[in-house]
From Swiss-Prot:
Signal peptide: none annotated. It comes from the Eukaryota. Residues 59-92, 280-294, 316-327 have a biased composition (Low complexity). Keywords: Glycoprotein, Membrane, Transmembrane, Transmembrane helix. Residues 1-20, 55-92, 279-303, 316-338 are annotated as: Disordered. The keyword Metal-binding does not apply. GO terms for cellular component: membrane. This is Putative uncharacterized protein DDB_G0292342. It is a multi-pass membrane protein. Residues 328-338 have a biased composition (Polar residues). It comes from Dictyostelium discoideum (Social amoeba). The keyword Ligase does not apply. Glycans are attached at N37, N83, N97, N105, N114, N122, N229, N240, N286, N302, N317, N322.
């Protein structure tokens, strides 16, 4: 498990070398925040990679448009750029820990909305998410996250108030929820016995003394002890009930979480499609504008040539008339001399 998480961190480091910084700065800030606060969460990593791929695709579209504009300004139109493609790198966490590359053709907006391609994309993004696979009380986590989980679990033994706060804020980890449920049930049991033993001060003191020793023991063991099934310290009856409740609650939360993950990634994909579609429209508009400009230039050149030819003809006609006038004057002079 440590090697797998190390591979994910290496993939993040490799991705950071090519992260764009010139477009969608809000996505970059969100991506950096996700990297800082949730690098061990598979869902957050998927969202971060999806946003980075969308930003990369937007930069590629802008570069292609700039290249097309430069070529059009130099009257070197090249229509072969219509078949360019965007490569979306989606490194999702699956059983084989592989990366999948999906080519999306930019030449048609309708091609992206194909049902088969959408199904494959959904399977790639959401098919093998580790939060929906909870088989043991010691759920999978990275080594650097174990200390945090142990600390939160130990806080749940600070009376039923600490357990309730942990249950409200921690819904994914089975390990944390197990200790919170176990502490909550023990606290409620002690409070219930206190009402039954309220008539005896000695029994009440013994009861609360045992509860205090139990909470101190569990706090120290969970905080500084080992991590795993062998160091869970599960009580015979309450422990089994706590384990079942923790697994059931985590599974319900994972389904709810996965549903919102589907919606969020769907919105990202739709926004990416809109970017590609807008890029195609801009490129087509640029091409049509360049064609119109070239047509106007040809018309202007033809009109100027016509004007020039008309000027030449008028000049020739005027010179001819002048020569005829000159000949008439010469004839008049000759007749006068005779």
């Amino acid at each position: 498990m440590y090697n797998n998480n190390q591979n994910h961190h290496n993939n993040d480091n490799n991705m950071n070398k090519d992260e764009p910084t010139t477009i969608y700065p809000e996505f970059i800030s969100i991506s950096n925040e996700i990297k800082t606060n949730g690098s061990t969460n598979s869902y957050l990593n998927n969202i971060r990679r999806e946003m980075l791929s969308m930003v990369n695709s937007g930069n590629n579209n802008n570069n292609n448009n700039n290249n097309n504009n430069n070529n059009n300004n130099n009257n070197n139109n090249n229509n072969n750029n219509n078949n360019d493609s965007i490569v979306i790198n989606m490194d999702t966490i699956n059983n084989n820990n592989n990366s999948n590359n999906i080519d999306i053709n930019k030449s048609g907006y309708s091609q992206i909305s194909n049902t088969t391609s959408n199904d494959n994309l959904n399977k790639t993004l959401l098919g093998n998410n580790e939060i929906s696979q909870i088989n043991d009380i010691d759920d999978d986590s990275s080594p650097e996250f174990i200390k945090y989980k142990k600390f939160i679990s130990s806080l749940s033994y600070i009376t039923f108030i600490g357990a309730a706060i942990v249950l409200i804020n921690q819904k994914k980890s089975v390990y944390i929820q197990f200790h919170a449920y176990q502490s909550f049930y023990i606290s409620m049991g002690v409070i219930g016995f206190q009402f039954l033993l309220i008539w005896s001060d000695i029994l009440s003191i013994i009861l609360w003394s045992l509860y205090l020793l139990f909470t101190i023991f569990m706090f120290l063991k969970v905080s500084f002890g080992g991590y795993g099934n062998s160091t869970i310290y599960k009580l015979p009856i309450i422990g089994n009930l706590s384990e079942q409740k923790a697994k059931l609650r985590s599974q319900e939360y994972s389904r709810y979480f996965k549903y919102h993950e589907d919606l969020f990634i769907k919105e990202l994909r739709e926004h990416k499609q809109a970017l590609i579609h807008q890029s195609n429209l801009n490129r087509n508009n640029n091409n049509s504008n360049n064609v119109n400009n070239n047509g106007h230039q040809r018309i202007n050149s033809n009109s100027s040539s016509v004007v020039m030819s008309g000027d030449v003809e008028s000049m020739l006609n005027s010179s001819g008339s002048n020569s005829s006038i000159y000949s008439d004057v010469q004839n008049d002079i000759g007749t006068n001399e005779e």
